Each structure stands twice: as C-alpha cells, then as structure tokens.
C-alpha cells in the first residue's frame, strides 16, 4: 500500500469512531496528479447527495498546463448497504461527520480513499488527548535510553 496523501491536520479535534475504504471516480489528469503525489486533503470533507457519497474540497494539483477544475466534487464508490449503514450512524450520533483520512494505492494499484466517521471533541477531551500523547512520547524516550 503506497500512501498518496494523508489528512493529519484535518482530523485534529476529532475522535475517530470507525474507518471504511471507498473507491473514487477520477478523471485521467487526476490519476496522473495522484501518481505524482500532488493531492491535498487538508480542508476536505464528505457529504451525501441523492444516496451517494461525494468528496469535496480535495485539491488535486494541475497536471501540466491543462485548464481544469481542481476542487470539483468527486464521487466515492461504495456498496449501497455500506452507504445506508454509514448514513444511519451519522444521523443517530450527535456532532458526527465523515472525513477522508488518506488516499492511497491498494495492492492492485487502484486508488482508494480511507474515510472515517468522526466525532468532534470538546476542549477538555483535546487536552486529555494531548497529555496522553505527550506521556506516550516520554515513555518511548525513556525506553530507548535504557535499551
């Protein structure tokens, strides 16, 4: 699995509930841009439209000198049952949304998007998460000094 782009900053302040894999419908120049690893997912999100999923605000950089729409909405490819299940969970849970976590090539060289059902964290949860992360870094540092 070769990662094209990750969405680290876009997931700050969110707690990941579950992850799914989806295909993506791309044009030829977008595939070439993905192979060149010039994709940005920072402010992107996923929305429902007529029972289908769409990726919005994902920036695929221009390939060569083509006049193209870089920030168009791209259709995500999932089974209908998975989409319905995801929509039901989104409606049932409060303050949840769907965000892309990364775009990658799978083992068959197909471009896939990993999407996550995420829930917004409040300020106290963010502080706890930062403390936990700092403690883990400190423990790793201490372990490396003794080994």
Swiss-Prot record:
It is found in: Cytoplasm. One of its GO terms (cellular component) is cytosol. Disulfide bonds: none annotated. GO terms for molecular function: RNA binding. Its main location: cytoplasm. PROSITE patterns: SSRP (PS01317). Keywords: Cytoplasm, RNA-binding. The keyword Transport does not apply. The keyword Cytoplasm applies. GO terms for biological process: trans-translation. Pfam families: SmpB. CDD domains: SmpB. It comes from the Bacteria. Belongs to the SmpB family. Required for rescue of stalled ribosomes mediated by trans-translation. Binds to transfer-messenger RNA (tmRNA), required for stable association of tmRNA with ribosomes. tmRNA and SmpB together mimic tRNA shape, replacing the anticodon stem-loop with SmpB. tmRNA is encoded by the ssrA gene; the 2 termini fold to resemble tRNA(Ala) and it encodes a 'tag peptide', a short internal open reading frame. During trans-translation Ala-aminoacylated tmRNA acts like a tRNA, entering the A-site of stalled ribosomes, displacing the stalled mRNA. This is SsrA-binding protein. It comes from Mycoplasmopsis agalactiae (strain NCTC 10123 / CIP 59.7 / PG2) (Mycoplasma agalactiae).
